[in-house]
A protein has these predicted regions:
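Residue-level marker of positions within ordered structural domains that often coincide
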Residues: 51, 99, 127, 141, ...
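Short, conserved catalytic/metal-binding motifs centered on acidic residues
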Residues: 94, 122, 136
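Short, basic interhelical loop/turn and adjoining N-cap
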Residues: 130-157
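A generic secondary-structure signal for well-formed alpha-helical elements
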Residues: 126, 144, 163-166
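Short, conserved DNA-binding cores of transcription-related domains
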Residues: 1-107
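Short, amphipathic alpha-helical "recognition" segments used to contact nucleic acids or chromatin
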Residues: 115-130
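Short, Lys/Arg-enriched anionic-surface-contact patches
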Residues: 102-118
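Long C-terminal interaction/binding lobes of large macromolecular proteins
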Residues: 2-44, 51, 155, 159-213
Length: 213
Protein backbone atom coordinates (compact mmCIF):
# COMPACT_ATOMS: atom_id res chain seq x y z
CA UNK A 1 0.00 0.00 0.00
CA UNK A 2 2.95 2.34 0.32
CA UNK A 3 4.69 1.66 -3.00
CA UNK A 4 6.37 4.85 -4.12
CA UNK A 5 5.43 6.70 -0.96
CA UNK A 6 8.11 8.63 0.89
CA UNK A 7 9.09 7.79 4.45
CA UNK A 8 7.53 11.06 5.52
CA UNK A 9 4.21 10.13 3.92
CA UNK A 10 4.23 6.77 5.69
CA UNK A 11 4.83 8.51 8.98
CA UNK A 12 2.30 11.30 8.50
CA UNK A 13 -0.73 9.36 7.29
CA UNK A 14 -1.39 6.47 9.59
CA UNK A 15 -4.68 4.72 8.84
CA UNK A 16 -8.14 4.85 7.36
CA UNK A 17 -11.55 5.05 8.99
CA UNK A 18 -14.36 4.31 6.58
CA UNK A 19 -14.59 5.09 2.90
CA UNK A 20 -12.85 8.23 1.77
CA UNK A 21 -11.41 9.22 5.16
CA UNK A 22 -7.78 8.93 6.25
CA UNK A 23 -6.26 10.11 9.53
CA UNK A 24 -2.99 12.00 9.75
CA UNK A 25 -0.45 11.54 12.53
CA UNK A 26 -0.56 15.32 13.05
CA UNK A 27 -2.87 16.13 15.95
CA UNK A 28 -5.68 18.67 15.92
CA UNK A 29 -3.77 21.31 17.90
CA UNK A 30 -0.73 21.37 15.62
CA UNK A 31 -2.91 21.15 12.52
CA UNK A 32 -4.94 24.16 13.63
CA UNK A 33 -1.78 26.17 14.33
CA UNK A 34 -0.44 25.56 10.83
CA UNK A 35 -2.30 23.76 8.07
CA UNK A 36 0.04 21.15 6.57
CA UNK A 37 0.80 21.36 2.86
CA UNK A 38 -0.81 18.96 0.40
CA UNK A 39 2.50 17.12 0.04
CA UNK A 40 2.98 16.72 3.80
CA UNK A 41 -0.24 14.79 4.40
CA UNK A 42 -0.79 13.19 1.00
CA UNK A 43 -1.99 9.60 1.66
CA UNK A 44 0.21 6.75 0.45
CA UNK A 45 -2.61 5.48 -1.74
CA UNK A 46 -6.15 6.22 -2.87
CA UNK A 47 -8.70 5.28 -0.20
CA UNK A 48 -11.08 4.10 -2.92
CA UNK A 49 -9.11 2.07 -5.47
CA UNK A 50 -5.80 1.62 -3.65
CA UNK A 51 -3.66 3.21 -6.38
CA UNK A 52 -0.28 4.47 -5.15
CA UNK A 53 -0.42 8.24 -4.70
CA UNK A 54 3.07 8.77 -6.15
CA UNK A 55 4.26 5.75 -8.18
CA UNK A 56 8.03 5.47 -8.33
CA UNK A 57 9.22 7.43 -11.34
CA UNK A 58 5.66 8.41 -12.28
CA UNK A 59 3.36 11.38 -11.93
CA UNK A 60 1.27 12.15 -8.86
CA UNK A 61 -1.95 10.14 -8.94
CA UNK A 62 -3.56 11.52 -5.77
CA UNK A 63 -3.70 15.27 -6.36
CA UNK A 64 -4.82 18.04 -4.02
CA UNK A 65 -8.53 18.82 -4.37
CA UNK A 66 -8.93 21.84 -2.15
CA UNK A 67 -9.76 22.49 1.48
CA UNK A 68 -12.89 21.94 3.50
CA UNK A 69 -14.00 23.40 6.82
CA UNK A 70 -14.64 20.98 9.67
CA UNK A 71 -16.29 21.78 13.00
CA UNK A 72 -14.63 20.47 16.17
CA UNK A 73 -16.48 20.55 19.49
CA UNK A 74 -15.26 19.96 23.02
CA UNK A 75 -12.35 21.16 25.17
CA UNK A 76 -9.00 21.67 23.46
CA UNK A 77 -7.31 20.11 26.51
CA UNK A 78 -8.32 17.89 29.45
CA UNK A 79 -8.76 20.95 31.68
CA UNK A 80 -9.98 23.31 28.99
CA UNK A 81 -13.40 24.89 28.58
CA UNK A 82 -15.85 23.44 26.05
CA UNK A 83 -15.65 25.30 22.76
CA UNK A 84 -16.50 25.02 19.10
CA UNK A 85 -13.61 25.44 16.68
CA UNK A 86 -13.45 25.34 12.92
CA UNK A 87 -10.44 23.81 11.23
CA UNK A 88 -9.62 23.26 7.58
CA UNK A 89 -8.97 19.72 6.33
CA UNK A 90 -7.42 18.62 3.04
CA UNK A 91 -9.05 16.70 0.22
CA UNK A 92 -7.45 14.74 -2.60
CA UNK A 93 -8.76 13.41 -5.91
CA UNK A 94 -7.54 10.21 -7.55
CA UNK A 95 -6.66 10.71 -11.21
CA UNK A 96 -7.26 7.02 -11.81
CA UNK A 97 -10.71 6.38 -10.35
CA UNK A 98 -11.92 9.91 -9.58
CA UNK A 99 -12.51 9.06 -5.93
CA UNK A 100 -12.12 11.68 -3.21
CA UNK A 101 -10.10 11.22 -0.04
CA UNK A 102 -10.32 13.52 2.97
CA UNK A 103 -7.41 13.67 5.41
CA UNK A 104 -8.31 14.52 9.01
CA UNK A 105 -5.90 15.40 11.82
CA UNK A 106 -5.43 12.84 14.56
CA UNK A 107 -8.06 13.23 17.24
CA UNK A 108 -11.09 13.79 15.02
CA UNK A 109 -13.78 11.18 14.54
CA UNK A 110 -15.48 10.48 11.24
CA UNK A 111 -18.99 11.94 10.99
CA UNK A 112 -18.94 13.31 14.55
CA UNK A 113 -18.63 16.94 15.62
CA UNK A 114 -16.99 16.19 18.98
CA UNK A 115 -13.31 15.31 18.92
CA UNK A 116 -12.24 11.83 19.98
CA UNK A 117 -10.38 13.41 22.89
CA UNK A 118 -13.54 15.15 24.11
CA UNK A 119 -15.45 11.88 23.95
CA UNK A 120 -12.69 10.05 25.79
CA UNK A 121 -12.66 12.76 28.45
CA UNK A 122 -16.42 12.43 28.93
CA UNK A 123 -16.13 8.66 29.34
CA UNK A 124 -13.37 9.13 31.91
CA UNK A 125 -15.19 11.79 33.89
CA UNK A 126 -18.38 9.76 34.14
CA UNK A 127 -16.92 6.26 34.34
CA UNK A 128 -13.67 6.66 36.28
CA UNK A 129 -13.97 9.97 38.11
CA UNK A 130 -17.53 9.40 39.27
CA UNK A 131 -19.03 12.61 37.89
CA UNK A 132 -22.74 12.64 37.19
CA UNK A 133 -24.02 12.96 33.64
CA UNK A 134 -24.82 16.61 34.34
CA UNK A 135 -21.36 17.36 35.69
CA UNK A 136 -19.77 15.56 32.75
CA UNK A 137 -21.92 17.54 30.36
CA UNK A 138 -20.78 20.83 31.88
CA UNK A 139 -17.14 19.85 31.36
CA UNK A 140 -17.49 18.69 27.75
CA UNK A 141 -20.68 19.92 26.07
CA UNK A 142 -20.42 23.11 24.02
CA UNK A 143 -24.11 23.93 24.28
CA UNK A 144 -25.42 25.96 27.25
CA UNK A 145 -26.84 23.67 29.92
CA UNK A 146 -30.56 24.22 30.47
CA UNK A 147 -32.86 23.00 33.19
CA UNK A 148 -32.43 19.28 32.48
CA UNK A 149 -28.81 19.20 33.57
CA UNK A 150 -28.80 15.45 34.26
CA UNK A 151 -29.88 14.57 30.72
CA UNK A 152 -27.30 14.28 27.96
CA UNK A 153 -28.33 11.91 25.19
CA UNK A 154 -25.05 12.50 23.35
CA UNK A 155 -23.11 10.62 26.02
CA UNK A 156 -25.58 7.74 25.82
CA UNK A 157 -25.20 7.60 22.04
CA UNK A 158 -21.40 7.46 22.43
CA UNK A 159 -21.71 4.51 24.80
CA UNK A 160 -23.99 2.75 22.31
CA UNK A 161 -21.50 3.38 19.50
CA UNK A 162 -18.67 1.96 21.62
CA UNK A 163 -20.76 -1.12 22.46
CA UNK A 164 -21.48 -1.70 18.77
CA UNK A 165 -17.85 -1.23 17.73
CA UNK A 166 -18.55 1.93 15.73
CA UNK A 167 -16.48 4.08 18.07
CA UNK A 168 -13.15 3.12 19.67
CA UNK A 169 -13.25 -0.47 18.33
CA UNK A 170 -10.28 -1.35 20.54
CA UNK A 171 -12.63 -1.37 23.56
CA UNK A 172 -13.95 -4.82 24.43
CA UNK A 173 -17.75 -5.09 24.83
CA UNK A 174 -19.06 -4.72 28.36
CA UNK A 175 -21.22 -7.41 29.97
CA UNK A 176 -24.86 -7.15 28.94
CA UNK A 177 -26.00 -6.16 32.43
CA UNK A 178 -23.32 -3.47 32.89
CA UNK A 179 -24.59 -0.03 33.86
CA UNK A 180 -23.82 3.01 31.74
CA UNK A 181 -21.23 4.12 34.27
CA UNK A 182 -19.51 0.71 34.15
CA UNK A 183 -19.54 0.82 30.34
CA UNK A 184 -17.94 4.25 30.42
CA UNK A 185 -15.38 3.04 32.96
CA UNK A 186 -14.32 0.09 30.78
CA UNK A 187 -14.00 2.28 27.70
CA UNK A 188 -12.07 4.99 29.54
CA UNK A 189 -9.69 2.47 31.11
CA UNK A 190 -8.86 1.07 27.68
CA UNK A 191 -8.22 4.55 26.30
CA UNK A 192 -6.02 5.47 29.26
CA UNK A 193 -3.90 2.38 28.64
CA UNK A 194 -3.05 3.66 25.15
CA UNK A 195 -1.71 7.02 26.31
CA UNK A 196 1.94 7.90 26.71
CA UNK A 197 1.09 10.40 29.43
CA UNK A 198 1.65 9.22 32.99
CA UNK A 199 -0.10 12.04 34.84
CA UNK A 200 -3.77 12.33 35.77
CA UNK A 201 -6.41 10.02 34.34
CA UNK A 202 -8.18 12.80 32.47
CA UNK A 203 -5.03 13.59 30.48
CA UNK A 204 -4.50 9.91 29.75
CA UNK A 205 -8.05 9.45 28.47
CA UNK A 206 -7.78 12.63 26.40
CA UNK A 207 -4.59 11.45 24.69
CA UNK A 208 -5.55 7.79 24.43
CA UNK A 209 -8.85 8.62 22.73
CA UNK A 210 -7.03 10.62 20.05
CA UNK A 211 -4.80 7.63 19.34
CA UNK A 212 -7.73 5.20 19.27
CA UNK A 213 -10.01 7.22 16.98
Amino acid sequence: MVVGASRRARRVVRRQSGKGIVYSAIDVKKWAEKIPTAAQVRPACCSRCGAASRPLGGVVVLVGHGLRERQVRGPAGPRGQPETRVIVVRRYRCERCGGLTTVLPRGLTARRHYSASAIGLALCLHGMQGLSIGETRQRVCTWPVGFETERWTTLISWLAAVAEGRLFPCVRPSPTQASQRRQAERAAATLCSLALATDELEAQAFEGAALAA
